Design a protein with these regions (language model features):
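Secretory targeting and sorting signals
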Residues: 2-28
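Substrate-binding/charge-relay-adjacent region of secreted/lumenal peptidase catalytic domains
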Residues: 25-92, 97-98, 102-360, 394-447, ...
Length: 536
């Protein structure tokens, strides 16, 4: 039996648990729009679940244009000017923003633009059609983004297991599990590094103080970039404590990401937020547990500002981790934005986590002894709760060169030439996770939103180790991870071969549920130092 087999025979039973399949083509569509580049899938579901308010009211709307290079887009500027539109572009960017009123946008790109009211009461503009690159611009513009003034998003809330007596990993046990205890004993605790948590909600300082006192860690008060965050919901509290458990001497920063989903232009705003964070904290390690919409809602052009800003930060030494998601490979489920019977359209990835330069972090169920010594791990998948590690194939990005060898290890029908996620994993099961303090109570954290800050903390430790031994900050880590996995002096990953999510199975080598596996940090740090010396 091929352990990686992931065809319809595998995931169909899981989807049928909730009902029969429906397809986006069954959604009601206005007759006059048929055959005019209609967008299908989750995007169509979003509009079908919203109230069509008619032609968009006069306002400035926008879409993103991905450019073929970094030169000034003179053709685009002239073309849009002739049609009553404007272009925003900065020197050296490989993307631009086209803006104008809805009528001008509609005429220029031969689309319909209406206003909609969503299920949550939000009002936004959208076109049910995908704008095409005009023939006159095809030498300069490679792709256009969606015309959509709303970004479906979710505020992650940690999966908390309230009835797990005497279980959960202490900070010392967590270090032991991933073989980072030796580095900690040698004084590598993240000193001199910075960990940035991107967040939609706040935290309770009393919980941070109690956590630190309980486990004998230094007290800390995070810095904040942006306006003060609203009331704590648990996610940011967990992220901070988990990162502190691994790297207690690293500086902690919370970045208010909530403005990115207020109004339109979310991905341009995310790119700007990344730039601001890089400017304020160059070389920091980033942890993201925010869902900024699934990849099937977008085009790659929409994410161009995010990808550009991430690359720039990585050139300054930043390493970035993003949770792969907790919907077991079904990240395109509608949630509060639309209702539908489970079907193929649900299969998808978190959009930002799928960017090739972003390190996507999956989740596992962990078994250890009382001291945290690693015994076993398997894929995290809770079928009754429809929760589990995210992962799968990108709808937007081609397979990067550093994943070529890994692609040969997945099932033949999954070798589509597209970016694969996750890249790596850490414990996410809320019944086997890390002890945290929330609202004054000791509970067990969970979700891939726990896995990402674990890796962020471990990377802060590795950065300190590398700098102390003549190395450099890691920066973009993905190519290094895959190179080390394909052959290095020390085994750096524990291969997770058991389990599945709703779409794929784990198996030997790389798989689409846990990636390369979970880390042996002592070995990984030493391999990275060797790789840096060879490259130098």
């Amino acid at each position: 039996v091929n352990r990686h087999h992931t065809g319809i025979a595998h995931w169909l039973p899981a989807l049928l648990l909730a009902g029969v399949l429906v397809f986006a083509s069954d959604l009601p569509i206005s007759r006059h729009l048929l055959g005019t580049n209609l967008i299908q899938g989750p995007y169509a579901s979003l509009l079908a679940a919203s109230t069509d308010l008619g032609p968009a009211r006069p306002q400035q709307i926008q879409l993103t244009a991905a450019l073929a290079g970094h030169q000034r887009p003179d053709d685009l500027i002239d073309w849009t000017h002739d049609r009553g539109l404007t272009v925003s572009w900065r020197p050296s960017d490989d993307w631009a923003i086209v803006e104008g009123n809805p009528d001008a946008i509609a005429r220029a790109f031969d689309v319909t633009v209406h206003d909609y009211r969503g299920k949550q009461g939000q009002q936004f503009y959208a076109s049910p059609q995908q704008p095409q690159v005009p023939e006159a611009l095809r030498g300069e513009v490679t792709e256009l983004g969606r015309i959509l003034g709303y970004t479906p998003h979710h505020v992650s809330r940690p999966d908390i297991a309230l009835d797990v007596p005497d279980r959960g990993l202490s900070p010392d046990a967590l270090l032991t599990t991933y073989n980072a205890d030796k580095l900690a004993a040698d004084g590598f605790t993240g000193k001199g590094t910075t960990i940035v948590i991107f967040a939609f909600s706040g935290y309770d300082q009393k919980d941070l103080d109690t956590f630190s006192a309980m486990f004998g860690l230094p007290q800390f008060t995070p810095e904040t970039l942006g306006d003060p965050l609203p009331v704590a919901h648990g996610e940011t509290t967990m992220d901070l404590q988990v990162a502190h458990a691994v790297a207690p001497d690293a500086r902690k920063v919370v970045v208010n990401a909530r403005p990115t989903v207020q109004g339109d232009g979310a991905y341009q705003k995310i790119g700007k937020l990344f730039e601001d964070t890089d400017r304020a904290y160059p070389g920091a390690v980033w942890s993201l547990s925010i869902g900024w919409g699934c990849d099937k809602l977008l085009t790659a052009a929409d994410l161009a500002p995010v990808r550009s800003a991430l690359r720039a930060a990585q050139s300054h030494g930043t390493t970035a981790y993003n949770a792969s998601g907790d919907l077991a490979g079904l990240e395109c489920k509608g949630g509060t934005d639309w209702d539908s019977v489970p079907g193929p359209d649900d299969i998808g990835l978190d959009s930002v986590s799928s960017i090739p330069e972003m390190t996507s972090v999956g989740g596992t169920t962990l078994s250890t002894d009382d001291r945290g010594t690693w015994l076993a791990e398997q894929t995290w998948f809770d079928v009754p709760l429809s929760q589990g590690t995210g992962g799968g194939l990108s709808a937007l990005f081609d397979l990067p060169p550093w994943q070529q060898a890994a692609a040969a290890q997945v099932a033949p029908e999954r070798r589509t030439g597209k970016r694969m996620t996750p890249d790596i994993s850490a414990v996410a099961d809320p019944f086997t996770g890390v002890k945290i303090v929330l609202n004054g109570d000791v509970v067990i954290g969970g979700g891939t939103s726990q896995s990402a800050p674990i890796w962020a903390g471990l990377t802060a430790v590795m950065d300190q180790y590398l700098l102390a031994n003549g190395g450099t900050l890691i920066g973009e880590i993905n190519p290094l991870l895959y190179r080390i996995a394909s052959g290095a002096p020390r085994p750096a990953f524990r291969d997770i071969t058991l389990g599945a999510n709703a779409v794929d199975l784990a198996g030997p080598g790389y798989d689409l549920v846990t990636g390369l596996g979970t880390p042996d940090i002592d070995n990984l740090a030493r391999n990275l130092l060797i790789a840096q010396r060879i490259q130098a």
